[in-house]
Amino acid sequence: MLDNNNFSVSSNENQQIILDGKATAANIKENLKARVARLRDAGIPVGLGTILVGEDPGSLKYVAGKHKDCTEVGIDSIRIDLPESASQEEVLDAVLGLNENPDCTGYIVQLPLPKHINQTEVISAIDPGKDADGLHPVNLGELVLHPHGDPGVPEPCTPKGIITLLRRYGIDLDGKNVCVIGRGVTVGRTIGLLLTRSDVNATVDLCHTGTVDLKDHVRRADVIVSCAGSAGLIKPDWLGDGADHNGVVLVDVGVSREVDAEIRGDFDRDCWTDPRVRAYTPNPGGVGPMTRVMLLENVVDMAERRL
């Protein structure tokens, strides 16, 4: 649970609460700095590794951001960059090298990988105890097997970050209807596992490209989490006002780039000022910073298990 001290809730001119991921992530980083310092005093190394294959501009920027975050909280960083032409064997060798590196507490393989690389094989080769993204099959299985309480494994960063952000702003999910749009492993499927744990206790409606009358599912929701990657998919006339008529909460995970290179989310921006909206995540500046800081938190959690 985040420290609520000295935190001010911001809102727009229509009094919707802006779920500020940047401010929340900064708050968490201050806590992580202290935890990292205690670990170092105990002689326990804290290091995050990254494996990047290719030169995708978005991936390069994201990986650079992760290493910058490490510097801010005192975590050592280990960066392995491979060319786009790297073979399956070369990628697996990099994975096995970090598995055996005592200075690497946890690490991630930046996704997506080039098409000629078997992504499932690469992720499965990660030591589950060093799986900073929480996407190894063993760790996902632990989430499935533990619907009550902490499974004791790294949790997927984006779902964990979303729930942390909502809790930080006092948004109670107990008994609420949450419509999740998108069934990918990194967000859609895995946030369903976290939302339905007994300590969160939400009801999840998981929608996807095969869902009939998506608008109707969205309208019934108290909270909408969209990770479809379809710019402006959700329009204001899709929104309801929540089961308790207290307004709906919008969580925008989608990232699309238009011809002007500006990031667009899954929600039409007119949704942000709709009177039925109680709170929303800006995009950018909402979910993204929370994903990155949860990666750091996973690494620190791993290191603390060595105490």
Give the label of every model feature segment:
Residues Q110-H116, S230-G232, V255-E258, G285-G286:
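Short glycine-rich anion-binding loops that position phosphate/pyrophosphate groups of nucleotides
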Residues E90-P102:
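Short, well-structured alpha-helical segments in soluble
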Residues V53-H67, P151-V251, E258-C271, P275:
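Glycine-rich phosphate/diphosphate-binding loop of Rossmann-like nucleotide-binding domains
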Residues L2-I44:
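Positively charged, low-complexity intrinsically disordered leader regions
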Residues P45-G54:
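Short beta-strand segments enriched in small/hydrophobic residues
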Residues T120-D131, L140-V144, H245-R306:
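Rossmann-fold NAD(P)-binding glycine/threonine-rich loop
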Residues I108-L173, V178:
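Anion-binding alpha/beta catalytic cores of soluble intermediary-metabolism enzymes, centered on
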Residues L48, C70-E84, T203-L206:
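Short beta-strand elements in bilobed, periplasmic/extracellular small-molecule ligand-binding domains
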